[in-house]
């Protein structure tokens, strides 16, 4: 994203709107999300799946130590695209809020409410001087009470929206196009996972292949209501079905 000289006076302070109604620091935060590794989520009647891509910036990087899908509580998880350090802070906050809700009310936190709490923090960092917006978008998904699948995405601006399928990061546009052509709500859990993996595969360059070491997959099915991450062996097995 590039701005002309006339815009430069408005991108120095986060609290100043440009004449066209933009907050340029928030727009820049969206650019950080677009540079992140591809991350996506899918919701069907069977449940919710979150998939995060892992890439080696250098051959010396141990990608096995990198997490892209996180468990927030027994019934909900998340993934992100953008600045990893910003994502870590928000994930820790979401976990603490989910735990606090369980301790006080003795029940799992509502996923919409948890997403709102995270989004409120993001929004707060768009209207105060001396801070910057979070350069990260989170996809949050799981099973709410009543066996209701939920999938939401939070933006750097603090806005959050529910989705049937959503993709962010470098391959977000391509994966979204794949979802628009192939999404069906009546898929079973295995086919929901396969849909997400195929959407991620559609973002690869010619000659590239998905491997169990460069993706993370988490899912929650309506039968168990539990969010869990797939093991290396499970990822290897599901990739063989592509």
Swiss-Prot record:
* Coiled coil regions, renumbered to chain: none
**UniProt-listed GO biological process terms:** proteasomal protein catabolic process; ubiquitin-dependent protein catabolic process
- InterPro entries attached here? Ntn_hydrolases_N, Proteasome_alpha, Proteasome_alpha-type, Proteasome_asu_arc, Proteasome_asu_N, Proteasome_sua/b
Quaternary structure note: The 20S proteasome core is composed of 14 alpha and 14 beta subunits that assemble into four stacked heptameric rings, resulting in a barrel-shaped structure. The two inner rings, each composed of seven catalytic beta subunits, are sandwiched by two outer rings, each composed of seven alpha subunits. The catalytic chamber with the active sites is on the inside of the barrel. Has a gated structure, the ends of the cylinder being occluded by the N-termini of the alpha-subunits. Is capped at one or both ends by the proteasome regulatory ATPase, PAN.
Which PANTHER family does the entry mention? Answer: PROTEASOME SUBUNIT ALPHA/BETA
Annotated gene: psmA
Activity control? The formation of the proteasomal ATPase PAN-20S proteasome complex, via the docking of the C-termini of PAN into the intersubunit pockets in the alpha-rings, triggers opening of the gate for substrate entry. Interconversion between the open-gate and close-gate conformations leads to a dynamic regulation of the 20S proteasome proteolysis activity.
What SMART domains does the record tag this protein with?
Proteasome_A_N
Annotated organism of origin: Sulfurisphaera tokodaii (strain DSM 16993 / JCM 10545 / NBRC 100140 / 7)
- Its recorded name reads Proteasome subunit alpha
The terms under GO molecular function for this entry are:
threonine-type endopeptidase activity
Q: Which NCBIfam families match?
A: arc_protsome_A, PRK03996.1
| Gene3D superfamilies linked to this entry | Glutamine Phosphoribosylpyrophosphate, subunit 1, domain 1 (3.60.20.10)
The entry sums up its family as follows: Belongs to the peptidase T1A family.
What top-level branch of life does the organism fall under?
A: Archaea
One Pfam family name from the record?
Proteasome_A_N
């Amino acid at each position: 994203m590039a701005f002309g000289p006339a815009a430069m006076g408005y991108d120095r302070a986060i609290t100043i709107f440009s004449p066209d109604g933009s907050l340029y620091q928030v727009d820049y935060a969206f650019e950080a999300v677009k540079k992140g590794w591809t991350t996506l989520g899918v919701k069907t009647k069977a449940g919710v799946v979150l998939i995060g891509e892992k890439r080696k910036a250098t051959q010396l990087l141990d990608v096995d130590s990198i997490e892209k899908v996180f468990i927030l509580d027994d019934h909900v998880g998340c993934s992100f695209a953008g600045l990893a350090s910003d994502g870590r802070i928000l994930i820790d906050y979401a976990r603490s809020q989910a735990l606090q809700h369980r301790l006080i009310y003795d029940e799992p936190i509502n996923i919409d409410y948890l997403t709102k709490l995270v989004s409120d923090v993001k929004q707060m960092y768009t209207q105060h001087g001396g801070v910057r917006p979070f350069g990260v978008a989170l996809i949050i998904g799981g099973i709410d009470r009543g066996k209701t699948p939920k999938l939401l995405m939070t933006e750097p601006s603090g806005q959050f929206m529910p989705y049937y399928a959503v993709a962010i990061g470098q391959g977000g546009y391509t994966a979204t196009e794949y979802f628009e052509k192939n999404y069906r709500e009546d898929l079973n859990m295995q086919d929901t996972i396969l849909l997400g993996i195929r959407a991620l595969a559609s973002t690869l360059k010619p000659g590239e292949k998905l491997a169990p070491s460069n993706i993370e997959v988490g899912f929650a099915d309506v039968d168990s209501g539990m969010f869990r991450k797939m093991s290396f062996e499970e990822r290897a097995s599901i990739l063989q079905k592509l």
